Design a protein with these regions (language model features):
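Active-site- and interface-proximal helix/loop "cap" or "latch" segments in soluble metabolic
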Residues: 67-121, 127-246, 253-261, 267-356
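Bacterial N-terminal signal peptides that target proteins for export
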Residues: 1-7
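Short, low-complexity, disordered segments immediately C-terminal to signal peptides
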Residues: 21-50
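C-terminal motif of bacterial Sec signal peptides marking the signal peptidase cleavage site
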Residues: 16-19
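Post-signal-peptide N-terminal segment of Sec-exported extracytoplasmic proteins
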Residues: 42-69, 90-91
Length: 356
């Protein structure tokens, strides 16, 4: 009897141990996954720092808890936007039966990534975060008298992006949002990544903070939670201290569906130019763009558009890059080397900035 009891006891112990081992391995795998980090780079054009943030694992399961969304309105570039705002990550399911026609979808979707008309001045801060295996979140922040004047996000896709034509391309003004709008994935959310960018920017400026909880646009929140918000939080303490760089930008409406912005960044102590940016932006609707050949570039900019240079024949990006290089070398707002089509618009902004 004693021997029988020992054998039975050993058999039960083996069953218990065998039942425990898979759970232990799962827990170790979970701990290993949660300890992984993604690279984060930070700095202004004068200096670069490095930090790191944890990469949150995203799941897309039927039993994922649903977020309760609230309708929130905000204004940008003369348009009132209404988004389904949520806190936390959301995954927008699509069963291919949205019940929305392309015409109705085009009517309901609206985004505006171009800068607002006016002048912005203050201390300049910049940060970049690499997240989710190769995406890069970029943020510019301008602060004056302890008040946030500007928050501007962008995102660059990875080199191995599934759609080759968008690999390594920024999303805000390239036409990527148009690509999203034409994709069935947005049939239910009716928002693009640009909606999430501007929705966050509006909150941060209005509430004068970069950290803490923010709402995101339902259906486009993963980039915000994994990239944009970590990038903003990384600057939350830095913007409390004076920056070494000063930011000045002027944005004007040139008419006929075209606007432009000139940005000059200088070192405060020496007034040396560290960066010069110039871009021209097409209006948010084709109806506003008078030149029929340019209507296809609505909501894009000449500098960042994926297709503008090749299809228009105007090598705007190279011309501006050459101007930027010369301005930094000579430390002054130089004129374009040739009679570029955009020269007159650029010169008008230079005169107004230098006369201040």
């Amino acid at each position: 009897m004693k021997t029988k009891k020992i054998v039975v006891g050993l058999f039960c112990s083996m069953i218990i141990l065998m039942g425990c081992q898979p759970d232990q391995r799962t827990e170790k795998m979970k701990e290993s996954t949660e300890s992984e980090a993604v690279q984060v780079t930070s700095g202004t054009s004068a200096a670069t720092n490095a930090t790191s943030v944890k990469q949150e694992e995203q799941t897309n399961t039927n039993d994922q808890p649903k977020e309760s969304a609230a309708k929130v309105s905000y204004e940008r570039n003369g348009h009132t936007f209404e988004v389904d705002a949520v806190s936390g990550a959301t995954v927008e399911a699509n069963n291919g039966q949205s019940g929305i026609s392309p015409e109705e979808k085009a009517q309901k979707m609206y985004w505006s990534g171009r800068p607002e008309i006016g002048e912005v001045q203050g201390d300049y801060y910049h940060h970049e975060v690499v997240f989710d295996g190769g995406y890069t979140a970029l943020i510019d922040v301008v602060v004056k008298d302890q008040q946030i004047q500007l928050v501007e996000f962008d995102e660059r896709g990875p080199k191995n992006y599934y759609s080759e034509e968008w690999a390594g391309v920024t999303k805000r003004l390239s036409g990527y949002a148009n690509f999203q709008a034409n994709n069935a994935r947005t049939d239910q959310s009716l928002v693009t990544v640009v909606n999430t960018m501007t929705f966050l920017e509006n909150q941060m400026v209005a509430e004068n903070r970069l950290d803490g909880a923010f709402q995101t646009a339902k259906g486009q929140s993963n980039s915000a939670n994994n990239g944009y918000l970590p990038a903003a939080r990384a600057l939350a303490k830095e913007i409390k201290e004076p920056s070494k760089e000063h930011y000045t930008s002027l944005t004007e409406d040139f008419g006929e569906g075209l606007s432009g912005r000139l940005t000059v960044i200088t070192l405060k102590d020496s007034r040396k130019i560290t960066d010069l940016r110039y871009d021209e932006y097409f209006a948010d609707t084709e109806e506003e763009i008078k030149d029929a050949k340019l209507k296809a570039y609505s909501r894009q900019s000449k500098y960042f558009s994926k297709d503008y240079a090749q299809k228009s024949g105007e090598n705007f990006k190279k011309e501006v890059d050459d101007l930027r290089k010369k301005a930094i070398e000579e430390n002054k707002l130089v004129s374009p080397t040739n009679e570029e089509a955009w020269s007159e618009n650029y010169q008008s902004l230079v005169k107004k900035i230098t006369s201040q």
